[in-house]
UniProtKB/Swiss-Prot annotation:
Native source organism of the sequence: Saccharophagus degradans (strain 2-40 / ATCC 43961 / DSM 17024)
Major location category of this protein: membrane
Gene, per the UniProt record: fluC
Pfam families registered for this protein in UniProt: CRCB
Family per record: Belongs to the fluoride channel Fluc/FEX (TC 1.A.43) family.
InterPro entries per record: FluC
Protein name in UniProt: Fluoride-specific ion channel FluC
Keyword Transcription: no
Membrane topology: Multi-pass membrane protein
Length: 133
């Protein structure tokens, strides 16, 4: 006996998949854009994490708090797109590589920058968006 997946669930799965595919492509584009710089500091990952956190704050207000978009957009944008766009795993491995290669000062500043700037970005986005919408 097989159980059918409700149409609503299937739509949400597809919404996450669509958003995730677009977020992954956007993430890859940022990496490619920063590649020629050949910096020791992982600017591309920091950029997507801070920008993604800011956008998460904006869409949290628009979708969750104010319900200005249909709930399915939470799955497309917040779970799919921003989930794929931001990257904790890359941040983790880059931090480890910096530490292991003897660049512990850069590693520590990278970890602090990611955490402080990302949390600050989401807070600023929420405050600004609540005032503007």
């Amino acid at each position: 006996m097989t159980s059918a997946v409700p149409a609503t669930s299937l739509i949400l799965w597809l919404a996450v998949a669509l958003g995730g595919a677009l977020g992954a492509l956007a993430r890859y584009s940022v990496s490619i854009a920063w590649m020629p710089a050949q910096l020791k500091f992982p600017v591309a990952t920091l950029t997507v994490n801070v920008l993604g956190s800011f956008l998460m704050g904006v869409f949290y207000v628009v979708i969750v708090e104010k319900a200005m978009l249909a709930p399915v957009w939470r799955h497309v944008i917040m779970i799919g797109f921003l989930g794929a766009f931001t990257t904790f795993s890359t941040f983790s491995i880059e931090s480890l590589h910096l530490w292991q290669s003897g660049h512990w000062q850069i590693a520590i500043s990278y970890v602090v920058a990611n955490v402080v700037l990302s949390i600050s970005a989401v807070v600023v986005a929420i405050v600004l968006t609540e005032k503007l919408v």
